[in-house]
Amino acid sequence: MDTKLILIEGLPGSGKSTTARLVHEILMQNGIESELYCEGDLNHPADYESVAYFENDQWHRLLEEYSAFRDQIIENCIPEDNGYLLPYKKLVPDIPDTFYEKVSKKDIYELPLDQNMKLIINNWERFSTRAASGKKYIFLNAVLYRILLQSV
């Protein structure tokens, strides 16, 4: 079996999450490898939930300004397209609120459209390459449609 991508779409409260969880659990109980990612999941492989993007100069200024948390910030960053991605909600809560206020302004969904689309397309290409090499079911709950709407 090749990897199967299953997108669950629907209106809020229509049973998307319940349906996705139920099918995922049935597959797993029957020994069929399956992954489930719901909207808002910080580990979602094809979404940038609470991820900021910084160009190199912005990144180095951020590290200087928050040098007390430098190691933790660097440990969680991902080099990307002449800059860095930072999944900022994955950082420990002892970082000051001013950090989160600053970083959330660089959230991928707050970037200019052309930059936003480039990062999202790169992420989907990476995701599809990884998924194609596997043999499992991957459920994405209501993310694709909203990502596309947010990107327009």
Residues covered by each model-derived region:
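Active-site signature of alpha/beta-hydrolase-fold catalytic machinery across serine-
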Residues: 22
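Conserved glycine(s) of the Walker
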Residues: 15
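ATP-dependent NMP and nucleoside kinases share a basic, alpha-helical "lid"
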Residues: 104-152
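Conserved substrate/cofactor phosphate-moiety recognition/catalytic segment
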Residues: 25-74
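Phosphate-binding P-loop
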Residues: 1-3
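Hydrophobic positions on the alpha1 helix immediately C-terminal to the Walker A/P-loop
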Residues: 19
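Hydrophobic anchor at the beta1->P-loop junction of P-loop NTPases
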Residues: 8
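P-loop (Walker A) phosphate-binding loop of NTP-binding proteins
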Residues: 11
